[in-house]
Swiss-Prot record:
Coiled-coil spans in chain: none
Protein name: Protein lethal(2)k10201
Purpose of the protein: Vital for development.
PANTHER family named among the record's database cross-references: ZINC FINGER PROTEIN 511
Biased composition annotated in UniProt, kind: Basic residues: 151-160
Zinc finger (C2H2-type): 74-97, 113-138
Keywords: Developmental protein, Metal-binding, Repeat, Zinc, Zinc-finger
Length: 221
């Protein structure tokens, strides 16, 4: 027993006073809060303002919305044109790729051009009337490009190529109107560099020689 008591370290006076000070005095009431067993939590690290966190969340949400808008853009299957809304895509398909719509516009019996805004139900006989309506009534910009036709570039290209084709036709007509000149040469006819007439016929060699002699005699006379 004495050896076990000697091995145990004795508490100092300050330690005993500290332990006794932590013991509550008197009776403990049921309403008294229990003594905390753990130390209060202390946040260690970099402090971030709540406004910065909200700003980053808003920026991330905006990027997500932009990506969704790009993925959900409306594309025409025929010409691959991108349009921002389903209504504009419907108008594009109807006006550019629908034969019934083109025939109805040529007849002109009823208005066929719908307004660019989906909420507006007014229709017009021509695209010009619709554009004026959207600029005046709905305050759309004057350089709104939705109603441009897809064949205008082709028409311009064809218009530019027409003068060239006419010039080629004129050159062909001029060459046809030129008189036929028969090619002949003095001496042995071994080589010919150019032949402007028709195909040579093998049965008229003597006639060509006789014509050449007559031409020489005319020159000497």
């Amino acid at each position: 027993m004495d050896s076990e008591a000697a091995g145990v370290a004795l508490l100092s006076r300050e330690q005993i006073i500290r332990i006794l000070s932590e013991v509550p005095a008197g009776f403990i009431k049921p309403t008294d809060p229990p003594a905390p067993s753990l130390a209060p939590f202390k946040k260690l690290g970099v402090l971030v303002d709540i406004d910065d966190i909200l700003g980053e969340q808003d920026a991330a949400a905006a990027r997500i919305r932009d990506n969704i808008d790009k993925e959900q853009s409306y594309s025409c299957v025929e010409c691959r044109k991108m349009l921002p809304t389903a209504h504009l895509l419907d108008l594009h398909i109807t006006e550019q790729h629908d034969c019934y719509f083109a025939a109805s516009v040529e007849r002109g019996d009823k208005p066929m051009f719908s307004c660019f805004l989906e909420e507006c139900t007014i229709k017009f006989h021509t695209a010009r009337q619709r554009k004026d309506h959207c600029i005046i009534t709905h305050k759309l910009p004057a350089n709104y490009r939705f109603d441009h036709s897809k064949n205008r570039g082709k028409q311009k290209h064809q218009g530019k190529s027409k003068p060239n084709s006419m010039e080629v036709d004129e050159v062909i007509e001029e060459t046809k109107s030129l008189p036929y000149v028969k090619a002949f040469s003095f001496g042995h006819q071994t080589q010919r560099s150019f032949y402007t007439g028709k195909d040579q016929r093998s049965g008229k060699t003597l006639d060509d020689v006789q014509a050449m002699k007559e031409a020489i005699n005319d020159i000497l006379d």
